[in-house]
Amino acid sequence: MQPRVLLVAALLVLLASARALEAEDPSLLGLMQGYMQHATKTAQDTLTSVQESQVAQRARDWMTDGFSSLKDYWSTFKGKFSGFWDSASEVQPTPASDAS
């Protein structure tokens, strides 16, 4: 064979294989779109996680403040009436000795 015919045949084989690979490989635009979709989903998931974390933290703070206020209220209530409860327990008559 002549070198020119061999060179043209090799070039045609390379072009045919490149065309076949191009059909199999996604285009650069497709790769970028896939990457951007993945990045967008990751960013949305992260933002949702942070927002849920902030909501949970606010709920915990609200519950802690509520229980703290309730504890303070109970301590104040108990402090005001502890003298009354102490004097009421001292004045209780004994049922057996008073009946005789």
From Swiss-Prot:
The most abundant glycoforms are characterized by an O-linked disaccharide galactose linked to N-acetylgalactosamine (Gal-GalNAc), further modified with up to 3 sialic acid residues. Less abundant glycoforms are characterized by more complex and fucosylated glycan moieties. O-glycosylated on Thr-94 with a core 1 or possibly core 8 glycan. One of its GO terms (cellular component) is very-low-density lipoprotein particle. One of its GO terms (biological process) is lipid transport. It is found in: Secreted. GO terms for molecular function: high-density lipoprotein particle receptor binding; lipase inhibitor activity; phospholipid binding. Keywords: Chylomicron, Glycoprotein, Lipid degradation, Lipid metabolism, Lipid transport, Secreted, Sialic acid, Signal, Transport, VLDL. The keyword Lipid biosynthesis does not apply. Residues 1-20 form the signal peptide. Its main location: secreted. Glycans are attached at T94. The record marks K41 as: May interact with the LDL receptor. Residues 68-100 are annotated as: Lipid-binding. Component of triglyceride-rich very low density lipoproteins (VLDL) and high density lipoproteins (HDL) in plasma. Plays a multifaceted role in triglyceride homeostasis. Intracellularly, promotes hepatic very low density lipoprotein 1 (VLDL1) assembly and secretion; extracellularly, attenuates hydrolysis and clearance of triglyceride-rich lipoproteins (TRLs). Impairs the lipolysis of TRLs by inhibiting lipoprotein lipase and the hepatic uptake of TRLs by remnant receptors. Belongs to the apolipoprotein C3 family. This is Apolipoprotein C-III.
